């Protein structure tokens, strides 16, 4: 008889546990008020998510712009550095050019045989200076007789009527012009031919 009582207790306990589990897992019947609260909560969360997504997109755009600005800055600094290396000695070269001009004039006017040693020394010095300048990218402007006058490289000191030369060509050069790495350092001072006036 005791066995029977023990079996009945087990069954009743099992039924109680089952009822408790069903009660815990059963979904409560939604009420209209809880549905409205849930919809409002979902709407708030969606709005917050949209705001955060917009903020993230704006931040990403800002990062991309900053990265582009930094890259442009690097390129500009690199270009300025290259220009500084290329043209940094411009003022020094401009100071040396008059000495070269004077040596060239001295050679043009040297005609005395007794000065041949001095003339030879000047030629050697001039040659060394020109060679050194060439190493640093200095080249003379082409301003020989018959060359077409180019205001980008030549400065006209006067105009000469000439039937022997084409109009707008160089007749003579007063002072050499120079380029530094293909950029004008000093224009050539020249005399330019014009067509003779008809009488």
Swiss-Prot record:
PROSITE patterns: GRPE
Pfam families reported for this sequence: GrpE
Compartments it resides in: Cytoplasm
Region (Disordered): 1-40
Keyword Chaperone recorded: yes
Amino acid composition bias (Polar residues), ranges on this chain: 24-36
Keywords: Chaperone, Cytoplasm, Stress response
Domain of life from the UniProt record: Bacteria
Any Gene Ontology biological process: protein folding
Keyword Cell membrane tagged: no
Gene Ontology cellular-component terms listed: cytosol
UniProt GO molecular function: adenyl-nucleotide exchange factor activity; protein homodimerization activity; protein-folding chaperone binding; unfolded protein binding
HAMAP family: GrpE
Function: Participates actively in the response to hyperosmotic and heat shock by preventing the aggregation of stress-denatured proteins, in association with DnaK and GrpE. It is the nucleotide exchange factor for DnaK and may function as a thermosensor. Unfolded proteins bind initially to DnaJ; upon interaction with the DnaJ-bound protein, DnaK hydrolyzes its bound ATP, resulting in the formation of a stable complex. GrpE releases ADP from DnaK; ATP binding to DnaK triggers the release of the substrate protein, thus completing the reaction cycle.
PANTHER family: GRPE PROTEIN, GRPE PROTEIN HOMOLOG, MITOCHONDRIAL
Assembly mode: Homodimer.
Similarity comment text for this entry: Belongs to the GrpE family.
Protein name: Protein GrpE
Organism: Geotalea uraniireducens (strain Rf4) (Geobacter uraniireducens)
């Amino acid at each position: 008889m005791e066995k029977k009582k023990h079996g009945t207790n087990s069954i009743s306990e099992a039924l109680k546990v089952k009822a408790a589990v069903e009660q815990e897992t059963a979904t409560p019947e939604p009420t209209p008020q809880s549905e409205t609260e849930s919809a409002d909560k979902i709407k708030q969360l969606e709005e917050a998510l949209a705001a955060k997504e917009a903020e993230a997109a704006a931040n990403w755009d800002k990062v991309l712009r900053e990265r582009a600005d930094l890259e442009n800055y690097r390129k500009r600094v690199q270009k300025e550095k290259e220009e500084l290396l290329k043209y940094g000695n411009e003022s020094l070269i401009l100071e040396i050019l008059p000495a070269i001009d004077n040596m060239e004039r001295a050679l043009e006017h040297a005609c005395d045989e007794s000065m041949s040693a001095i003339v030879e020394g000047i030629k050697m010095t001039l040659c060394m200076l020109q060679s050194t300048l060439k190493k640093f990218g200095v080249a003379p402007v082409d301003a020989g007789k018959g060359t077409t006058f180019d205001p980008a490289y030549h400065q006209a000191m006067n105009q000469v009527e000439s039937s022997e030369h084409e109009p707008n060509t160089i007749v003579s050069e007063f002072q050499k012009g120079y380029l530094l790495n293909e950029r004008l350092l000093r224009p050539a001072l020249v005399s330019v031919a014009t067509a003779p006036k008809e009488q």
